[in-house]
Amino acid sequence: MGIEVVVLLTTLMLDAAVGEPPALLHPVVWYGKLISLLERAKFRKMLVEIFYGAFCCLIVITFALILSLLPFPYPLNFLWAVYLLFSSISVKSMVNHARVCVESGVDRKAVQMIVSRNTEELSEEQLCSAVIESVAENYVDGVVAPLFYFSIFGVAGAVVYRAVNTCDAMVGYRKGRYEAFGKFAARLDDILNYIPARLSLLFFELLKRGAFSYGLKRNVKLNGCAIAAMSYLLGVKLEKPGYYSLPGIEPSAADIERAIKAFVRLTVIAVIFTTIAVSIRIVLLTKLHF
């Protein structure tokens, strides 16, 4: 068994036990603080703002890459690799956040913790929809994408992806103050998510036949096919008022629980896929070496 497979399995056990690192020691928090610090500079010309935003995003990416390449001796290098991959995925923390929403009676403040839209304007069904959509999106951002890049580039791939994803989450807005500054981060995140988002549809297909084609046809945004697939899998209406509406029955708190169970099953599938992909890469690299 290759060392990267051991890193992956150890990471998953750590995630199941802990959930996520404390904020002070969380690399994703570091990326967020760094981009927040850099974005304070303002420029009047949009083109200059776009290039400066790209420069800042590249600084965060470089910082993340340096973290993944720090030359620790064994076994510290193994532990560091586990920690970085652990901080790049989000399984238990997503499950916990979604369950808090259910246990609170789908309270607006609880839902606001995991979505960017204004929950004060949403009905109870729309609040449930927002949570389910968040679970579906996190399956791509917090599971499939980091594991996909880990399977190709090792820990560095997962870490760099997470840095880009964090920049997008912080400043990658299509409108408002970050429209120019966050353009590069938003576009780069779209590019990096393109394959993982569609790969996730294959995993949905294993749970319900037809999910792959439905996700492609009903893609609510560039990489929102997992939302469409989750709607199809659960048979519920998922909507973001003013943006998209997927047909189905009105969602309830019980459907959030169903989404959580589906998320866990889909994560197991993604882990199996990643283990196989990493093993194949190791075998191919070994043959090329000899």
UniProtKB/Swiss-Prot annotation:
GO terms for cellular component: plasma membrane. GO terms for molecular function: ABC-type vitamin B12 transporter activity; threonine-phosphate decarboxylase activity. InterPro entries: Cobalamin_biosynth_CobD/CbiB. The chain crosses the membrane at residues 5-25, 50-70, 71-91, 140-160, 266-286. One of its GO terms (biological process) is cobalamin biosynthetic process. Keywords: Cell membrane, Cobalamin biosynthesis, Membrane, Transmembrane, Transmembrane helix. It comes from the Archaea. It is found in: Cell membrane. PANTHER family: COBALAMIN BIOSYNTHESIS PROTEIN CBIB (PTHR34308:SF1). Belongs to the CobD/CbiB family. Converts cobyric acid to cobinamide by the addition of aminopropanol on the F carboxylic group. This is Probable cobalamin biosynthesis protein CobD. The lineage of its organism: Archaea, Methanobacteriati, Methanobacteriota, Archaeoglobi, Archaeoglobales. The gene is cobD.
